[in-house]
Design a protein with these regions (language model features):
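Short, amphipathic alpha-helical "lid/cap" segments that border enzyme active or binding sites
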Residues: 77, 150-153, 251
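Active-site-proximal cap/lid insertion segments
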Residues: 1-146, 159-167, 218-220, 245-248
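C-terminal cap/loop subdomain of S1 sulfatases and analogous C-terminal strand-loop tails that border
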Residues: 106-112, 151-153, 158-229, 246, ...
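Active-site-proximal N-terminal segment of extracellular/periplasmic enzymes that hydrolyze or transfer
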Residues: 237-244
Length: 267
């Protein structure tokens, strides 16, 4: 970015953290160590398909992990601030227009429900930040309707004036970003496949639409969850017995054109 470029520039910067191992700069760890609360899900056992990933968990261990994770998040913010500053300086120096796009691939339980890392379909793992700023982007707006990582490619292509990619499952978020339009009825999905310890392969799928979120596992249908994340952010209450029709509709949408049994058989 310190050099002039005649062609449009796409600069991709990847960072490892925040991620395990949970090692943060000492001053940031100390900053959050005394401020960190234990999650209300600490003593709630994860579902059976997650049990193989459980580790020894104590309140002090979880507090330390979460303090380190929050410290890593702040350190990430500081690093991103430097990248954003360099990008803005480059645009200003050369009179160019540009967009800054930040996203992540997954979250982290950090002791929530007794385990660490990703590989679940709870909000701790699947909900991530997606932040876009720059020319033409509505500043200070927060979208309430679900979006997906699959939206990144079509959005960037439209921003760049490039040809639309074929066979896209995502959508361009330009109307949302430029005019604050909401897609209140939109459904987004995530999928999960794992070889739990001694339990065989399992395949799970999550769908979020409107106020509801459904989590289903092919090998453990008895553990299906219907959750209302807006009113139940820690996902403590399974509402499937109260709203079976909502669960049926979401399940049909989540597994439409998905050969789940074949995925499990072929691993």
């Amino acid at each position: 970015l310190s050099q002039p470029h005649k062609k449009p520039q796409c600069v991709v910067v990847g960072t490892y953290a925040p991620h395990f191992p949970y090692i943060a700069p000492t001053e940031l760890y100390d900053k959050y160590r005394m401020r960190t609360d234990l999650p209300p899900t600490l003593d709630i056992m994860a579902s059976a398909q997650d049990a193989g990933r459980l580790r020894d968990t104590t309140p002090e261990l979880v507090k330390g992990v979460r303090a380190a994770y929050w410290g890593l998040i702040e350190f990430e913010d500081l690093c991103l601030g430097q990248v954003k500053s360099a990008w803005d300086t480059y645009l200003s120096r050369h009179g160019k227009r540009g967009i800054f796009f930040y996203l992540s691939d997954h979250g982290d339980h950090a002791g929530d429900r007794g385990f660490y890392g990703k590989q679940s379909l709870y909000e701790a793992a699947v909900r991530i930040p997606m932040i876009v700023s720059g020319d033409g982007i509505l500043a200070g707006n927060r979208l309430r309707s679900p979006v997906s990582l699959l939206d990144a490619a079509p959005t960037v292509c439209q921003l760049a004036g490039a040809r639309e990619l074929p066979f896209q499952d995502g959508v361009s978020l330009i109307p949302d970003l430029e005019r604050g339009e909401e897609r209140e009825d939109r459904a987004v999905t995530a999928e999960w496949i794992n070889l739990p310890y001694g339990r065989g392969t399992d395949y799970g799928r999550m769908i979020r639409q409107g106020k509801w979120k459904l989590i289903s596992y092919v090998s453990h249908p008895e553990e299906e969850l219907l959750i209302c994340p807006d009113s139940d952010p820690w996902e403590l209450y399974n509402r499937i017995a109260e709203f079976p029709e909502a669960a049926d509709e979401l399940r049909e949408a989540a597994f439409h054109n998905v050969c789940a049994g074949r995925i499990v058989e072929e691993k």
